[in-house]
């Protein structure tokens, strides 16, 4: 990272598992805690989003899968097997959900206001941006280890109808205005 002067790196997680027999979840968590943006599954759009969030807000973020979407209650559950330890109130070392090997991290996160953002499209010229409230840490057996239920301030059916990919980025606090200003200044189109 230092030699190449990198600010962010994606990891091809499932290839890593195939090659080494273990996961990179803990390594990615520790890199993020050290201020090196590290994302999963080779998702360059989400890694770019995480980098933009860090530069604009100074905050670390959580890359996650929308794993449960309830349009009726306007809630989603975001889940993933890695999160920077510094973002958690406490954490539990578990195995990786999909493979049941290696290390996955179940982070217990504080409740409160959050921002959800994703830069997308091949040219990174579209984005999703919303705020919500993290209301609960869940512990379902059928999804990745860190799980948070979020009551959205915009329609949750976006995740069912027009999502900009799978991973979305969550950060603590309401940063909608600063992110909106940056994305609009760069001629990006907001997707609702």
Give the positions of each predicted feature.
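Long, internal scaffold/assembly segments composed of regular secondary structure
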Residues: 1-47
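Flexible, glycine/charged-enriched surface loops at secondary-structure junctions
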Residues: 2-8, 60-66, 192
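Fold-independent oxyanion-binding glycine-rich loops
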Residues: 12-14, 66-67, 81, 174
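Generic preference for flexible, low-structure residues
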Residues: 17, 22-25, 68, 77-79, ...
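C-terminal catalytic subdomain
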Residues: 35-142
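Extended hydrophobic packing segments that form well-structured cores
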Residues: 104-192
């Amino acid at each position: 990272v230092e030699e190449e002067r990198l600010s962010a790196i994606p990891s091809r997680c499932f290839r890593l598992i195939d090659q080494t027999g273990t996961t990179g979840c803990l390594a990615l968590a520790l890199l993020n805690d050290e201020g090196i943006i590290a994302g999963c599954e080779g998702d360059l759009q989400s890694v770019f989003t995480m980098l933009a969030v860090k530069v604009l807000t100074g905050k670390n973020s959580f890359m996650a899968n929308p794993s449960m979407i309830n349009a009726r209650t306007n809630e989603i559950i975001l889940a993933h097997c890695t999160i920077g330890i510094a973002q958690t109130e406490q954490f539990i070392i578990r195995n990786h959900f999909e493979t049941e090997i290696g290390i996955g991290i179940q982070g217990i996160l504080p409740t409160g206001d959050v921002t959800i953002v994703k830069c997308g499209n091949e040219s990174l010229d579209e984005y999703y941006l919303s705020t919500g409230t993290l209301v609960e840490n869940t512990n379902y057996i059928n999804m990745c280890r860190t799980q948070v239920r979020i009551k959205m301030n915009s329609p949750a059916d976006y995740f069912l109808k027009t999502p900009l990919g799978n991973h979305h980025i969550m950060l603590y606090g309401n940063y909608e205005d600063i992110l909106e200003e940056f994305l609009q200044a760069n001629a990006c189109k907001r997707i609702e």
